[in-house]
């Protein structure tokens, strides 16, 4: 793994965070391949979480990008009461580890923290995520996002824009 690749992947993930914080949903969704998987599993116990979304519960599971597109549609049209009003968010990505997979895809493992404020309630979600990225001519596309939420309590709504 080269320093140039690490830098490019890090910048891509920082841009993803910025797009989400700025509610730039079209550009945000465009970062995902059409058939990209998005998964936030639930915990089974203190040290094990659901590995297969078809065999256990998940906080969020989208088999492909259409799940994110549907969620954004509901937010934009006011049909998502849990997201009205949207929270202000600040996504932080750190401890980025990058490696090239045998099939030419890129794996990026990160730690993340999202601070949010909605209707006077401030909070923080944090965890780890693994991305599988497909290199493009000038950037990357997300093939898979697997985020593990480390919070024990969810005192508010948990949605894709919190992760």
UniProtKB/Swiss-Prot annotation:
Question: Pathway listed for it?
Answer: Aromatic compound metabolism; anthranilate degradation via hydroxylation; catechol from anthranilate: step 1/1
GO BP annotations of the record are: 3-phenylpropionate catabolic process
E.C. numbers = 1.14.12.1
- Alphabetically ordered keywords of this record: Aromatic hydrocarbons catabolism, Dioxygenase, NAD, Oxidoreductase
Pfam families documented for this protein: Ring_hydroxyl_B
Which Gene3D superfamilies would you find in this protein's record?
Answer: 3.10.450.50
> How is activity influenced by pH?
Optimum pH is 6.3 for the reverse reaction.
- GO MF annotations in UniProt: anthranilate 1,2-dioxygenase (deaminating, decarboxylating) activity
Which reactions appear under catalytic activity for this entry?
Answer: anthranilate + NADH + O2 + 3 H(+) = catechol + NH4(+) + CO2 + NAD(+); anthranilate + NADPH + O2 + 3 H(+) = catechol + NH4(+) + CO2 + NADP(+)
Q: Which InterPro entries match?
A: Anthranilate_1-2-diOase_ssu, NTF2-like_dom_sf, Rng_hydr_dOase-bsu
Q: Which family does it belong to?
A: Belongs to the bacterial ring-hydroxylating dioxygenase beta subunit family.
Q: What does this protein do?
A: Component of anthranilate dioxygenase multicomponent enzyme system which catalyzes the incorporation of both atoms of molecular oxygen into anthranilate to form catechol.
User: Assembly and interactions?
Assistant: The anthranilate dioxygenase (AntDO) multicomponent enzyme system is composed of an oxygenase component and a NADH:acceptor reductase component (AntC). The oxygenase component is a heterohexamer of 3 large (AntA) and 3 small (AntB) subunits.
Q: What name goes with this protein?
A: Anthranilate 1,2-dioxygenase small subunit
What's the source species for this entry? Acinetobacter baylyi (strain ATCC 33305 / BD413 / ADP1)
Task: State which gene encodes it.
Answer: antB
